Amino acid sequence: MKKEEIVRETVGAPAHGKAVRFLLAVSLLVIPGVARAADAGPDPGPAPAPTPAPVAQDAAAKADAGPRLDIYGFAMLDMGYQTKQNDPNWFDVVRPTKLPAFKDQYGEDGHFYAGVRQSRLGVKGFIPTEAGEIKTIFEFELFGTGVDAGQTTFRLRHAWGELGQVGAGQTWSPFMDPDVFLNSIEYWGPTGMVFFRNVQLRWTPWQKGDSRFAIALERPGASADQGDFAGRIALQDVKGRFPLPDLSAQYRHAAGWGHVQLAGIVRQMKWDDLNTDQFDLSGDATGWGLNLSSNIKIAKKHVARLSVVYGAGIQNYMNDAPVDVGIERNLGNPRTPIVGKALPLVGVVAFLDLNWNAKWTSTVGYSMIDIDNSDGQSDDAFKRGQYALANLLYYPTPSVFLGPEIQWGKRENFRDGFTSDDFRIQFSAKYNFKLSLGGK
């Protein structure tokens, strides 16, 4: 499928190793106190959630505690065998959009792979003030995307700060529920999940425990598929434009049984025809979506992770989806023979994390995404993706796990009837660390 990128900024860009070492060195000088090691446990969670501004007495008490810096991360090895084939830039993940659109598109079947690209390094800062606690996070990993796809290189995950009800920087979109992500060793995750770290300005006017309401202005972006009209001169000077930020919001209710979250988003996408020919291909589309998600505790130790999302023109917020806008034929209008259409989609996630005991866990489940393609897209355009896995992981200590996982993915094309699938067996080992400096 040939695709024209309008704007699709990747979540983060490579960071030079010297910059990371400089950051750590400065932190050691600025933050007083004695270092103390801590058991990191499982994967460090997402960026800190926004908190309401504390009362003056609480702020003063926290100020007495002094500033603290947490340095954390993990080293992780992935080794596996892929029985089929996919885009070699995505050799170590299961992404249905990167599976072949026609027979043997990426060569012969059967590939062994190994890497450390999931390895991560992060720094969290906590500085008490009279106005409340300033929370910051800088987090990087080694998984290259965008121009660095397929490479082992530093990539920014989070660059985030917050004070009281207001947060700013790059972190999880409020349209997303990061707690839906399962305890797996496959890096990319469920194809039907909303998953996007985005630049944003966020306000959380209400929070009580893990329950909250938040609203954000987010960096816009989208991509388009020219489909059967790719390469036409008339389309060469059609340029995308985003006059407004994306507007997202979430409401989460948390209780002893787990939580339920409803999130929504609305966005404006425009494209301008700069050609002076007989056609006027300028247009616009409104993207929107609703994402209902939940964690449900079962027998006090197992967790069901569930979500369903529906909308149109929100593909760049999805974990694995192709384009936000497709071509629709409008041949009855000689001035505007084609128009752009925000593509509708539905995505589903259903996984079960099983915690057998302190040493053993398993995860099993399924995810899918389905696109309502436009009639101007090519026959081999991406239509539907499916994803499933099961694993058994062993924890010799809370900071270390290792174990195998079986992984499966499938791609279905729009009109030509072609399908391709992926089956893998992967083994991973992960070693967490955490060091706290300062505080009392």
Which residue stretches match the model-derived regions?
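Outer-membrane beta-barrel "beta-signal"
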Residues: P396, S420-K440
